[in-house]
Structures are given as C-alpha cells and as structure tokens.
Amino acid sequence: MIEISRRKLLAAGAAGAAASGAAEALPTRPWIRYQAERATANARARWRADMIRETYRMVWVAPDWNAKEMFEAFIGPDGIPTHGAACVTYPGDPGRRMAFVAIDTQDPNSITMLRTFKKLSHLIDFHIFPLAFLGPVSEFQGATILGAPNRALAMDDQITLFSQKGSNGIEYDVSRISEDSERKIWANTNLFRATRGVDVPFGVYLGMDGGYRPFNNQPDWDHYLALFDLVKAK
C-alpha cells in the first residue's frame, strides 16, 4: 500500500483550489468576453475623444476660419500644393494620411513641433509650409529651404542648428536666393493669411473619420498620437 504524507496531500489540495479559482476568474463564456472587449473599446474611445477635445481647446483660430477650406487651399486632391505654394515632405509608408503644417523657421514652438513630427513622418504625410511670418530672417531661411536640392535635408539642418545655443538656424546668402523661391515663400504666407490663419505653428489633419482636425504645438506625445489616429488607447 502506497502511503502519502499529510504534507503532500495538503499541497495537492492547495494547488487544486488555486487552479479552480484561476479558471473561475477567466471570462469563459462568450458574452463575458464580449462585454470585456466592449468596455475596453469604450474606454479607448473616451480617451481619444478627451485628448482631441483638449487639443482643440489649445488651438486659436479666427471666428470665420474653416478647416476644410484651409487644408484644400494648400493641398490639392492629388496631394500636390496649390496656388503656387511649396512645402517640405519626408519619405514614409505609402498611403499615409496627410496633414498640412504651417511653420516659421524662427519660431521655437514650430521647431519643437517639427522635431516631434520627424518621429511620426513614416506614418503621417506632413506637408510642411515655411512662412515669412516673423520677419526677414524667416523669409530668407524659408526661401533657402524651398530652393534646396533636398528640402527635407535643409529643414533637418534648420531644426538641428536652431536648437544650438547662439544659433538662429541655417545660414543664407540673399544674393543667391532665386526669384522662384521668393515667390514660393510669399505664396505660402499670403495663402495662410487668405485662409484666415492667425498664428504658427498651425496645422490641419485629415482624420480617418473624414474630419478636418486643427492642431498646434501640443504639450505631450499622447495628444499627437490621439490626434493622428495612431493609437486606440493610452
């Protein structure tokens, strides 16, 4: 006859009870799983909605401003700038959703926002339009970037140099800036004003729901992720 010690019996009993409790804790029935998934989806939707509402509260727009009108004034149906405007874009995944972005090379908030967008450019197709908004330096730097053989590289140089102490960004030679580049920077600036833009940085994103969402420099990463439909939950 095989003898089993009392200690082994107690251990086996405890293990069986734990397994039974764990099994009961799992949502074994389909409707329970459905309810749990629905609650999670609702929580995600509420989080995104809260983030987007908070983003809107931070954006300053004119009373008669129209998001769709501004977006389509800068970016045509084929994704090409219109009205003589010109922009900087970065390579990324095909089929990315588009965002119009107006910046000034001498505006610290614009540079901060662009630094963040560099991390998202493979997911969102940012069309970045430099403006001559804050003065002659902005005009000449913007024109230099738009006239560069590689605009994205020139913009990267501006972001890097502007962030260095004692530097206001890339150097430029007024005598070498083409008339075409000058026309483009002023086309950007005048179009922004014509569509009732009031401050930089400023942008409009075409969301997955077909809505046009205005934005500016946001306080944290989560706001951008929610705004650009990049996450479902925090």
Feature locations, PLM:
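Alpha-helix boundary/capping residues
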Residues: 16, 148-149, 162, 228-231
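Extracytoplasmic thiol/disulfide redox context detector
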Residues: 22-101, 105-137, 176-199, 220-234
